[in-house]
Amino acid sequence: MREIVHIQAGQCGNQIGAKFWEVISDEHGIDPSGNYVGDSDLQLERISVYYNEASSHKYVPRAILVDLEPGTMDSVRSGAFGHLFRPDNFIFGQSGAGNNWAKGHYTEGAELVDSVLDVVRKECENCDCLQGFQLTHSLGGGTGSGMGTLLISKVREEYPDRIMNTFSVVPSPKVSDTVVEPYNATLSIHQLVENTDETYCIDNEALYDICFRTLKLATPTYGDLNHLVSATMSGVTTSLRFPGQLNADLRKLAVNMVPFPRLHFFMPGFAPLTRRGSQQYRALTVPELTQQMFDAKNMMAACDPRHGRYLTVATVFRGRMSMKEVDEQMLAIQSKNSSYFVEWIPNNVKVAVCDIPPRGLKMSSTFIGNSTAIQELFKRISEQFTAMFRRKAFLHWYTGEGMDEMEFTEAESNMNDLVSEYQQYQDATAEEEGEMYEDDEEESEQGAK
């Protein structure tokens, strides 16, 4: 019933993907060999969304693991939950994409893409009523960004009416692997704007700041960053995995969250923020969770929501708590900060509550915001892109794989358009429309005279 097929591409995608499966397997009572060892019917009620029940009563993730080199997938396979995945669903090349978007999208990735699509088809045939796909990848490398976006457009071609949802890790100068990240990211965003329905922007810079400032980790590792990502992914998929009424599938979430088709880049947040291994022992209250969740420091994208306005917001509270208190707190925060919510979409904040908290916490809350402040993130990438592109630095790596400079120019202008669209709706007020009609009437009256 209402299945989601999960695809993870590239090193980053496979690492956060593997972590995601560890976390949700734990929440659903699935052990590393796929047996159910849980104690609650709620864990099994919607298990088929992410897992396929095999003949031996084992639960197998509907996951497809893709990379252009074998390294990361070997470590996933030998990791704690490596035997959970279907062995045929590991698809990898040997050559690697060398952090080059063109290799992932046009050359190396294009050679591997058909064998990936075969596995995608097989997974979809196993579904009763597929609701859509989710992809975990990064935008800074070669495989996740180049081949990831290639997969999106191919899957989109074949399943045009299914929802396409991505968890996209956006590069940042603070945690940088390669100098060409701005190129790869811009080329990817160019694709995501057109071909996805929902994109959660997870930003290394924000994750790094959270580890550094809030969790007081002196030297955050990728493991620490991934811990935050998996908590957030577990949170935003809660309403898809456990019984509930609100945003219970990807399409309903999209309908609530996306007022204009291009503006589907969400800013996720999570509360309470905890370190790996030291989950908090103090019980949090609903007001504290609500405060924290709307705090700029808790956002997983390095943008300050106070610099923009929320078009729409969805929140998920987890744990045993009073619905009434949750509703009161959410109303309070909206009326106190009403200037940060656009007034031309009434009731633009939706709240879901799920009884099952994540492991180690009594309560938690997850935040999904569609804020115009996300333009800060695109501006940041755009500035870095322009600085290099003006001098045509590193371009030969891309043109050598058959790309044209035009494609860079198009991607750049598409991203700049996206920024201006966010700005336009940030400045829009509810009155403007009415004033425009009055002017028209006056003109037509004068015309009638």
From Swiss-Prot:
Region spans: Disordered: 421-449
Positions bound to Mg(2+)? 69
Entry-annotated residues carrying Phosphoserine: 444
* Residue spans of biased composition, Acidic residues class: 429-449
User: Where are its TM segments located?
Assistant: none
Complex formation: Dimer of alpha and beta chains. A typical microtubule is a hollow water-filled tube with an outer diameter of 25 nm and an inner diameter of 15 nM. Alpha-beta heterodimers associate head-to-tail to form protofilaments running lengthwise along the microtubule wall with the beta-tubulin subunit facing the microtubule plus end conferring a structural polarity. Microtubules usually have 13 protofilaments but different protofilament numbers can be found in some organisms and specialized cells.
Q: Mind telling me what this protein is named?
A: Tubulin beta-4 chain
Q: Which organism is it from?
A: Gallus gallus (Chicken)
